[in-house]
Amino acid sequence: MTTPKKTAKISGNEARELSDLSEDIGIRFKYQNSERVYLQGSRDDIRVPLREIRQDDTYTAQGTEANPPIPVYDTSGAYGDPAAHIDLKQGLPHIRTAWLDERGDTEILPKLSSEYGIERAHDPKTAHLRFNQITRPRRAKAGRNVTQLHYARQGIITPEMEFAAIRERMKLDELFRRPEYAKLLKQHTGQSFGANIPTRPDQITPEFVRQEIAAGRAIIPANINHPELEPMIIGRNFRVKINGNLGNSAVTSSLTEEVEKMVWSLRWGADTIMDLSTGAHIHETREWIIRNAPVPIGTVPIYQTLEKTGGIAEDLTWDLFRDTLIEQAEQGVDYFTIHAGVLLRYVPMTANRLTGIVSRGGSIMAKWCLAHHRENFLYTHFDEICEIMKAYDVSFSLGDGLRPGCIADANDESQFAELHTLGELTDKAWKHDVQVMIEGPGHVPLQRVKENMTEELQHCFEAPFYTLGPLVTDIAPGYDHITSGIGAANIGWYGTAMLCYVTPKEHLGLPDKEDVRTGIITYKLAAHAADLAKGWPGAQLRDNALSKARFEFRWRDQFRLSLDPERAESFHDETLPAEGAKIAHFCSMCGPKFCSMKITQEVRDYADKQKAQRQGMEEKAVEFVKKGAKIYS
C-alpha cells in the first residue's frame, strides 16, 4: 500500500492543496497477497465486496499441503479494488441510485432547502473549496416515509438489507461445506448473554436482517442522499462494528487532511466515520468526505450550529438547529448525534462530579438550558426532529451528554437519568419509524461495565448500543487506546453493537493519521475479541489460520493474516531483516535452539517416527505368528 502524502496544517493554501488532489492522491490500497472478491446478490447491482487473503502452501516430509484463502470483511470500498477508477474530485459511483428510484417514494428537489446550504453554495469566498459535482438533493414525497425501519415493518426486504446480509455472512455458508476448511472453522462456544446470535452462517439471511431492523435491534444507516454508500448493519446480533472519528478544529488540520484521514480510516477497517469538525469550512469538508465515503457518515449537528452563532451557546435557537439538520441531511449524513436527553433538571445532578460534564454536546446544551432556564429545545422539538429524519432516512445516535468523564463519576444518578430519557425518546422515534441507536460511556471501571449494558437493554428496549470505549482506568494518557480497548472488548461481548475508537492522543490533542491507524487497529481487535466471545459463526477462522501459519513458520502468511500486516512484518524485520528469515523456523525472541514451536515439531516428528517403528515391529510380529512362530525353519 502507498502511504498517503503528508498534507500541511492550515496555511491559507487550501485551494492549492485541493488542486493537488490527483486521481488517486496516493491512497489506493494494495493489501499483501489479497484479492478483492464480489459476492453477487439477487440482482446485478448488488455486488458485495470482501477480501480474500491467499496463503502459501505448507511443505512437510510427507509432501505439500495447500492452505485455502481466508475471507475477511472489507470496508475499503473502491479504494481496495485494483480495477476501480478513483478520482476524489468526482466522488465515488452512485451504487444506490437505481434502488432509490425504483421505490418511487422520493423526489429530486429543485434546489437546496437549507438557507445556510444555499448561502454556502453561492458564497464566492468558498468557491475554491467547493466540491464541484454536487447533485440536487432527494427528499421523501409528501406523506411518505423512506426509512429502512419503515420498510422492514412493512415486510419489505430492500436491496440495502440484502446487501448487509450478504456482507455479514461473507460466504461462510459455502466454507462450512468445504472439507479443506473443516479444521479452521473449529470454534469455542460463545456466551451471548441472551442475544439472538445466529448459530450457522445460513441463518444470516435478508429476512433475518429485516426482522432485526423491524424489532429496532439493528439499524442500516443509509441516507437517501448518500448513494455512494455500501450498506452495513449495526446491531447486537451481528458482527461488532467500529467507528472512527475525524474532523478539523480551530487550532489544526485542513480540509484535504481530513479527506485523507477518512480514506486512511477505511484502509484499516473503520465501519463508520464521524466528522466532528469544529473549525473552518465545516460544510465544505463534510461534502468532500461524504462524496468519497463508501461507509456511513455521522455528525454532531450542534457543533456546526454553535459555529454559526460564533461559539455562543446562549444564542442557539431551534430554527438555526433545524436548518442545520436539513443542510446536513441534504448533503447525505447517515446518522446524527442528538443530545436530547440532557434535561434541565439533570444538570444539577452533575455538580458533585469529579469532572462534571465532559461531552461537548452535553455541555453546550446544559449551558443553554441554564442560561435560559428552559428545557432543552432538542427534547421539546423532538417530534419535529423525527419528521426531518424520516424524510431523508437519517438515523438517530441519541447522545450521552452526561456520560462520565472519569471512573469516579461512572454509573451515577445523572448518567442513568439521561439513559432512561433516551429510552423514552427511542420509543418516540420508533413511532415515526426512525432508526435509533444509543450512545454510551465513557469512563467506567471494569467491574461496572456490564451494568451499563444491562441498563441500556432494559430501558432502551434493545436498541443498538454505541459506546466510547469505555476507558477502565484514568492513569494512562498516551495509552488510552488500550485503557478503552479493554472496556470495549468487554462491553462488545455483553452486547454493544458498535464501538467508537479512541486514539493514543485522547485527552491530549487532535489525532494524526498514525494515531487513527493505531486507534482503528486497537478497536478492530476489541470488536473481534467480542465476536469470538459471543460466538459469532466463523469468527475464529482467521485466528485458526494464523495460528496454523505460526506453527508451520509461514512468516509471510502470519503477516498477511494479521490486522496490521505492515507493522507485524516491520517488527519481525527489525532483528531478522534477511529474506531467508521469512522461511526460518525461529524468530529473534528464542533463537534457533529454544523455539518452543520448533521443538514441538521435532517432538511430533520423533513421535511419528517411534509410532512408525512400533507399527513396523507389530507387523513383523504378526508375520512371525502367521508363519508358525518357528525360530528355525
Swiss-Prot record:
Which positions does UniProt annotate for [4Fe-4S] cluster binding? 587, 590, 595
Needed cofactors: [4Fe-4S] cluster
Q: What is its EC number?
A: 4.1.99.17
Relay the cofactor remark from the entry: Binds 1 [4Fe-4S] cluster per subunit. The cluster is coordinated with 3 cysteines and an exchangeable S-adenosyl-L-methionine.
Which amino acid positions bind Zn(2+), per UniProt? 443, 507
The GO cellular component terms are: cytosol
Kindly tell me the pathway this chain contributes to: Cofactor biosynthesis; thiamine diphosphate biosynthesis
Name the chemical reaction catalysed here: 5-amino-1-(5-phospho-beta-D-ribosyl)imidazole + S-adenosyl-L-methionine = 4-amino-2-methyl-5-(phosphooxymethyl)pyrimidine + CO + 5'-deoxyadenosine + formate + L-methionine + 3 H(+)
A single MF term (Gene Ontology): zinc ion binding
Its top-level enzyme class, in one word, is lyase
Q: Which UniProt keywords apply?
A: 4Fe-4S, Iron, Iron-sulfur, Lyase, Metal-binding, S-adenosyl-L-methionine, Thiamine biosynthesis, Zinc
What InterPro entries is this protein classified in? ThiC, ThiC-associated_dom, ThiC/Bza_core_dom, ThiC/BzaA/B
TM region(s), chain numbering: none
Residues annotated to bind substrate: 245, 274, 303, 339, 359-361, 400-403, 439, 466
Q: Which domain of life is it from?
A: Bacteria
Q: How does it assemble?
A: Homodimer.
| Its biological purpose | Catalyzes the synthesis of the hydroxymethylpyrimidine phosphate (HMP-P) moiety of thiamine from aminoimidazole ribotide (AIR) in a radical S-adenosyl-L-methionine (SAM)-dependent reaction.
Q: Which family is it part of? A: Belongs to the ThiC family.
Mind telling me what this protein is named?
Answer: Phosphomethylpyrimidine synthase
